[in-house]
Structures are given as C-alpha cells and as structure tokens.
Amino acid sequence: MSLLTEVETPIRNEWGCRCNDSSDPLVVAASIIGILHLILWILDRLFFKCNYRFFKHGLKRGPSTEGVPESMREEYRKEQQSAVDADDSHFVSIELE
C-alpha cells in the first residue's frame, strides 16, 4: 500500500498506521524522487539568478580581450558593472561593436 493512501485507525486506544511494509521498491523510489525534487526546488529558489544566467548564456565569459588596450578593458568593465547596477532585477547584456 502506498504511503499516500495509508489509513490511520485507532488501535488499542492509540493512533497507528495500518500499512504494508514500507520497504516496497515503489515507495522507496517515490520517496527518493520526492526528496530530490524538494532539494532541487529549494536550490532553484536560492540561486535562481545564477541558474537562469547560466542556462541563458552558458559558460561564455564574454568577448576576448586579447589585443585590446587596458584602458578599453577598464571602460568595458565599468559599462558592464553600471548596466548590472542600473537594473538589478533583469539581466542586461551589452555587446561591443
């Protein structure tokens, strides 16, 4: 019998559960899936910005800065930071021409 359908009945003046052995493979699998789902949901809510940024942009770190002068690199970093600071609730992607 599934844990979802177990029935509580009074037994010897106490409340107890009348259910079959809970080592049923289906019950164990459902419990494991339920626990994993709960853990993944909690992690998703805690790190939703990081998760969605990762899935949207992948592992891209941005354009290559090889051969670009340091002053232009610093200007690009400032633009990126100001874009993130301007609107913290949405992701802003700036691409240089």
Swiss-Prot record:
Glycosylated residues, chain numbering: 20
Q: How is its activity regulated?
A: The M2 protein from most influenza A strains is inhibited by amantadine and rimantadine, resulting in viral uncoating incapacity. Emergence of amantadine-resistant variants is usually rapid.
Task: Write out the topological domains of type Virion surface.
Answer: 1-22
Site, Essential for channel activity, possibly by being protonated during channel activation, and by forming the channel gate and the selective filter: residue positions: 37
Q: Which residues form the signal peptide?
A: none
Q: Which residues lie on this side of the membrane: Intravirion?
A: 44-97
Keyword Transmembrane helix part of the UniProt annotation: yes
Q: Which Gene3D superfamilies match?
A: 6.10.250.1640
- Where does this protein reside within or beyond the cell? Virion membrane; Host apical cell membrane
Site described as Seems to be involved in pH gating, located at: 41
UniProt topology in membrane:
Single-pass type III membrane protein
Residue ranges spanning the membrane: these are: 23-43
Q: Which residues carry this modification: Phosphoserine?
A: 64, 82, 93
Q: What else is known?
A: When the channel is activated, one or more imidazole moieties of His-37 probably become bi-protonated.
The UniProt family comment states:
Belongs to the influenza viruses matrix protein M2 family.
* Protein known as: Matrix protein 2
The gene designation is: M
